[in-house]
């Protein structure tokens, strides 16, 4: 039976509070039963409520295509096309249709390529995102089915079990209580218990239990969707668009200046005819505008986007690639990104209190007091320490298991051994277990001392106790409890995190840890990862009451130099990004929950990590499909390679604009040489076709964050373009005003004659301009000698094919409509030789420009000692000092000053040198943990043992 929209109107308009009314009224309002919906009813409700996902604005393909033809560069070309046919030719000649058709063809080709590449990249990203779409187990037509979570509707009955991400807002039905992790929504770090009748939110995670639920809200109507809706999808203009506009404006202004000079000289001074003057202006317009620039850059980014997707980073916003190349600060979540998000026990640090018990026995006892199925994180960590999880119940018979509850804060197992004797083991919060112990007063001080030592290292403590139950009944209180041991729990770093952070530092990316955990845990993770321990509680920096010890220093400076932040709330993430951006850093931010969305949106590069919620993915620029930090660093390298290609092209484009404008302007003004506009179109078409291949060029990624340096681009473009223009002017003078080439090479003369029509000279100038202009790309793509850096094969092949075509046109073409005449192979050879000879100084000019722009940069690099140093071997000297210090400390050659480790440093008196010394001493502990001897000494120091006595008895 079909649903009438008005029946569910109250639900759609949210005038009924489905979250708080009795569960029977929920079913009544939703017009559903515990047997679920039929497929037909679900489909009808889907048309009423919409899909269970966040809305995304989609642009029509046609308007997107037109967008590529609607920008300042295209406007200039469109104006040139109109000039070609609208302005009179004079003498009864028809309009220049060939120029008009050529310009329009060039525009359409560029727009089509841009559209196809960007559309393909978008489709690829959409397909990958679709693969990440969550699934849900739903009751339809009386059968349980696995469906995409997007098709859920209010009234559906769903099944929720351990590990599931709740697909929609729902009310729980009959069953055991669930443990729900709502941290992605509310920031609560601990799971909350939800029982029958309680509401659960879309985006939260089930950590324990299994139950059925009725869906009460989907899509934008969920708590999740409303929170995400608050994050404005602002279409702010990115760095890339600003740079593109700046380069385009520079080229347009250069052309405008050239045209104004031509108009002033040609008409009032030279008294040139109307139409030849217009043709000269068209040459500057057509040849000077880098019409292919948006296309080349779009194609380069689209191909780069495919490459990033293969590496596990889906690019939602293309221009994020350019911003990632310049990223110099990455704020990374600790849990799940830097660490495994999986608790483990360090067996070698277990502190045993009972006689005759070793660490393996302690682990076995703790495992017996753990669930073997439907485990929480601590149970999984303990049982995971066993060689085989079955050992937890091997040789015993379980009588009763006491699950964890907030009151007792412990678990316990009552069991019978092989001889039929009853025993009980318990694990839990140390205070609760200590309270059970019969000898509490004797061991209390030692227990607290060990807990404090663990806490200093950022380790959580778990206590284990044991008792015999002589009565043999599970209800019996049993004999005296014996306090067995304290186990240290820690979320270990990923195996590749330390190496990845080292690579990031070498690449000039400063990784800052963001964690909701306490400061000690953050510092211990920092030590193990080698990323520094200069960390602060975020509330001390950004809260209402600032820590007195750091109140004298600017918060922005502390945030900039910090290695991480502990106790972070979602609003702190946003503030951290905002302050880093205020200090001119390009900032990346990782996140996974709805509460991270504002910070992800604010960051220059928002990165949604693996398993992030839809809201985080929606707010982000890049979505990761693999866990860990290494995929981000790989994406940084790939982005820098992509950026290098784009930067190489923009320098080339500016150079060509200057060479065309200056070169042809001088020829027109000095010798009244009218170059055919159609031949400039041919140069543009061949050059643009070749230059497309730069998107797959072989490049070396920059070793440091790379950004658009407009001064460098414009200066290089003006110098190289000016040099090429003078090459053309000198060639024209030698060919037109002297007999140098006929005398030396025996070619026919192109000197001025009484009946000069410039046709052969136009062919010669065409070939000279075409070959050397396109060869310039090999100079702009190189950081050293261009012939020493091997370009991509595709670029080389495209260059030779294009220039073979250009040479054949110059040699054989007799095109009256284009006013050119073939010059033969002799002149073609002379022009190629001329260009090769004058090509070599281009590299020298590029070196001189870099040197001139560098100023005293190297002196600054050597003296700079902050975390954002531009040194290639970032931190090498500091790492060597850390290692030397660690070795001296390890072998007793030097006793470190305990003040170095003081947490209450007076920052007013702290100078830079002392701060560095403090950091070196703290990080040195990491080195101890990475050697066998160092690890032993670490344990010895932690436990306060006598190392000399041990060394006398054992060889370490």
Curated annotation (Swiss-Prot):
Gene Ontology annotations for the cellular component aspect, listed alphabetically: plasma membrane
Superkingdom: Eukaryota
EC nos: 7.1.2.1
Family: Belongs to the cation transport ATPase (P-type) (TC 3.A.3) family. Type IIIA subfamily.
GO biological process: proton export across plasma membrane
Cytoplasmic side of membrane: 1-65, 119-247, 301-647, 698-713, 781-792, 844-956
Catalytic reaction(s) noted: ATP + H2O + H(+)(in) = ADP + phosphate + 2 H(+)(out)
InterPro entries, A to Z: ATPase_P-typ_cation-transptr_N, ATPase_P-typ_cyto_dom_N, ATPase_P-typ_P_site, ATPase_P-typ_TM_dom_sf, ATPase_P-typ_transduc_dom_A_sf, HAD-like_sf, HAD_sf, P-type_ATPase_IIIA
Tissue: Expressed in roots, stems, leaves from both vegetative and flowering plants, and flowers at early and late stages of development with highest expression levels found in flowers and root tissue.
Protein name as it appears in the record: Plasma membrane ATPase 3
Keyword annotations: ATP-binding, Cell membrane, Hydrogen ion transport, Ion transport, Magnesium, Membrane, Metal-binding, Nucleotide-binding, Phosphoprotein, Translocase, Transmembrane, Transmembrane helix, Transport
Catalytic machinery residues: 333 (4-aspartylphosphate intermediate)
One matching Pfam family: Cation_ATPase_N
Residues that coordinate or bind Mg(2+): 592, 596
SUPFAM superfamilies: Calcium ATPase, transduction domain A, Calcium ATPase, transmembrane domain M, HAD-like
Source organism of the structure: Nicotiana plumbaginifolia (Leadwort-leaved tobacco)
Topology class, membrane: Multi-pass membrane protein
Chief location bin: membrane
Matching PANTHER family: CALCIUM-TRANSPORTING ATPASE (PTHR42861)
Localization (cell): Cell membrane
Extracellular side: 86-97, 269-278, 670-674, 735-759, 814-822
Residue spans crossing the bilayer: 66-85, 98-118, 248-268, 279-300, 648-669, 675-697, 714-734, 760-780, 793-813, 823-843
Molecular function GO terms recorded: ATP binding; ATP hydrolysis activity; metal ion binding; P-type proton-exporting transporter activity
Biological classification of the source: Eukaryota, Viridiplantae, Streptophyta, Embryophyta, Tracheophyta
Function: The plasma membrane ATPase of plants and fungi is a hydrogen ion pump. The proton gradient it generates drives the active transport of nutrients by H(+)-symport. The resulting external acidification and/or internal alkinization may mediate growth responses.
């Amino acid at each position: 039976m079909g649903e009438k929209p008005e029946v569910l109107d109250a639900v759609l308009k949210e005038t009924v509070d489905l979250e708080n009314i009795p569960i029977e009224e929920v079913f009544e309002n939703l017009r559903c039963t515990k047997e679920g919906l039929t497929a037909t009813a679900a489909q009808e409700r889907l048309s009423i409520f919409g899909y269970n996902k966040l809305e995304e604005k989609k642009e029509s393909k046609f308007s997107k295509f037109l967008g590529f033809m609607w920008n300042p560069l295209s406007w200039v070309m469109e104006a040139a096309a109109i000039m070609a046919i609208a302005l009179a030719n004079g003498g009864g000649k028809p309009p220049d249709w060939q120029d008009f058709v050529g310009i329009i063809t060039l525009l359409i080709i560029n727009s089509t390529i841009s559209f196809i590449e960007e559309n393909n990249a978008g489709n690829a990203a959409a397909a990958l995102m679709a693969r990440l779409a969550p699934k849900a187990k739903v009751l339809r037509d009386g059968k349980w089915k696995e469906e995409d979570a997007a098709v859920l509707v209010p009234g559906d009955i769903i099944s929720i079990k351990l590990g599931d991400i709740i697909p929609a807002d729902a009310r729980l039905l009959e069953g055991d209580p669930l443990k729900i992790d709502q941290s992605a929504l509310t920031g609560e770090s601990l799971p909350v218990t939800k029982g029958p009748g309680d509401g659960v939110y879309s985006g939260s995670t089930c950590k324990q239990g299994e139950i059925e639920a009725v869906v009460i809200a989907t899509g934008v109507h969920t708590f999740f969707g409303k929170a995400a809706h608050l994050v404005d999808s602002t279409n702010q203009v990115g760095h890339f668009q600003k740079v593109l506009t700046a380069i385009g404006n520079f080229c347009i202004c250069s052309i405008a200046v050239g045209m104004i000079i031509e108009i002033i000289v040609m008409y009032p001074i030279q008294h040139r005819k109307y139409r030849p003057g217009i043709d000269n202006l068209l040459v500057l317009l057509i040849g000077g505008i880098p019409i292919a620039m948006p296309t080349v850059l779009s194609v380069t980014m689209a191909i780069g986007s495919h490459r990033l997707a293969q590496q596990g980073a889906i690019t939602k916003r293309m221009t994020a690639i350019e911003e990632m190349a310049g990223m110099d600060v990455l704020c990374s979540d600790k849990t799940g990104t830097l660490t495994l998000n999986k608790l483990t026990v360090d067996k070698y640090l277990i502190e045993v209190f009972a006689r005759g018990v070793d660490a393996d026995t302690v682990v076995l006892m703790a495992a017996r007091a753990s669930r073997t199925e439907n485990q929480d994180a601590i149970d999984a960590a303990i049982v995971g320490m066993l060689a085989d999880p079955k050992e937890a119940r091997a040789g015993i018979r379980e009588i009763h298991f006491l699950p964890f509850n907030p009151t007792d804060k412990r678990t316990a197992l009552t069991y019978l051994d092989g001889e039929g004797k009853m025993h009980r083991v318990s694990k839990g919060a140390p205070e609760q277990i200590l309270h059970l112990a019969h000898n509490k007063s004797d061991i209390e001080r030692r227990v607290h001392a060990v807990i404090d030592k663990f806490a200093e290292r950022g380790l959580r403590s778990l206590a284990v106790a044991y008792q015999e139950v002589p009565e043999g009944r599970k209800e019996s209180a049993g004999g005296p409890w014996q306090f067995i041991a304290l186990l240290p729990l820690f979320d270990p770093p990923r195996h590749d995190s330390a190496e990845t952070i080292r690579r990031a530092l070498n690449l000039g990316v400063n990784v800052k840890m963001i964690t909701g955990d306490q400061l000690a845990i953050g510092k211990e993770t920092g030590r193990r990862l080698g990323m520094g321990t200069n960390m602060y509680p975020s509330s001390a920096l950004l809260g209402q009451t600032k820590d007195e010890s750091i109140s004298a220093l600017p918060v922005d400076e502390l945030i900039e130099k910090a290695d991480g932040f502990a106790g972070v709330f979602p609003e702190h993430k946003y503030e951290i990004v905002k302050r880093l951006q205020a200090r001119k850093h390009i900032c990346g931010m990782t996140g996974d929950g709805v509460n991270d969305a504002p910070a992800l949106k604010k960051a220059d590069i928002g990165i949604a990590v693996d398993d992030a919620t839809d809201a985080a993915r929606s707010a982000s620029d890049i979505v990761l499909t693999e866990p860990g930090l290494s995929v981000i660093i790989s994406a940084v390298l790939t982005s820098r390679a992509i950026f290098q290609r784009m930067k190489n092209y923009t320098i080339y484009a500016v150079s060509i604009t200057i060479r065309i404008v200056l070169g042809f302007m001088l020829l027109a003004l000095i010798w009244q040489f009218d170059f055919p506009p159609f031949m400039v179109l041919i140069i543009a078409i061949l050059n643009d076709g070749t230059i497309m291949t730069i998107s797959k060029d072989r490049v070396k990624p920059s070793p440091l964050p790379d950004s658009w340096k407009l001064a460098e681009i414009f200066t290089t473009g003006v110098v190289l373009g000016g040099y090429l223009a003078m090459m053309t002017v000198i060639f024209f003078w030698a060919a037109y005003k002297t007999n140098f080439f006929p005398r030396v090479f025996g070619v026919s003369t192109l000197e001025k004659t009484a009946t000069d029509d410039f046709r052969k000279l136009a062919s010669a100038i065409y070939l000279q301009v075409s070959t050397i202009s396109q060869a310039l790309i090999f100079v702009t793509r190189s950081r050293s000698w261009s012939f020493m850096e091997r370009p991509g094969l595709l670029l080389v092949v495209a260059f030779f094919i294009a220039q073979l075509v250009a040479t054949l046109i110059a040699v054989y073409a007799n095109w009256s409509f284009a006013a050119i005449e073939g010059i033969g192979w002799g002149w073609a050879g002379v022009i190629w030789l001329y260009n090769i000879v004058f090509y070599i100084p281009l590299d020298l000019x590029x070196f001189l420009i870099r040197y001139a722009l560098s100023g005293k940069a190297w002196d600054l690099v050597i003296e700079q000692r902050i975390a954002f140093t531009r040194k290639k071997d970032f931190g090498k000297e500091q790492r060597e000092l850390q290692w030397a210090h660690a070795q001296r400390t390890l072998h007793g050659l030097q006793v470190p000053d305990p003040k170095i480790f003081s947490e209450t440093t007076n920052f007013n008196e702290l100078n830079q040198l002392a701060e560095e010394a403090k950091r070196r001493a703290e990080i040195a502990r990491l080195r101890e943990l990475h050697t066998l001897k160092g690890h032993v000494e670490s344990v010895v120091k932690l436990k306060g043992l006598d190392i000399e006595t041990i060394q006398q008895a054992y060889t370490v």
